[in-house]
Amino acid sequence: LDLLLAAAAAARDRRRLEREELGDVGYALDDRRRGDPVLLVRDGVTLHVTLNRPERRNAYGTQLRDALVDALRLPLVDESIERVVLDGAGPSFCAGGDLDEFGRTPDAATAHLIRTRGGAGRLVAHLAGRIEVRLHGHCVGAGIEIPAFAGRVVAHPATVFRLPEVSMGLIPGAGGTVSIPRRIGRWRAMHLFVT
């Protein structure tokens, strides 16, 4: 609750500052010039959220995760956002966890907190009725675990889905053990997990 209240206060402050800088056009504009890991574009009542690390196939690293979490908190505190569209720039929606960051958390407790409290899956689940995720290219690990929480998922016919964690002796860390069986059933999820 404290985290949500802090996020709401930060979002209010951000909106106020951006209104002062931009006039009353809104608080989310296309920021491609700055190379942000997540781009936000407000179009009326719709917030477009784009994963923006195409050179890394939108690998789900710390910066992208934190920026995505911030972006997904906006519709929770701004009731004028009726719809969220989440997609990815470049050839893939999301290639899963950023392998350059694996094993870099200082301890197991921090890693657990990041997985259970710091990820985007819970926010996507909370926004399920208002969010559409558009998938293309490769959707690996977090790239399918998080979208599976959404109310509407649209995938290009050539999209490739993979959950390699189990074959590496790991548990899917972005909520896939919950989201994927709920979305496609436990038997299909099991097949996806072990193949």
Task: Label the predicted regions.
Residues 49, 86, 98, 146-148:
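Hydrophobic/aromatic residues within transmembrane alpha-helices
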Residues 57-58, 100-103, 190:
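Nucleotide phosphate-binding site architecture
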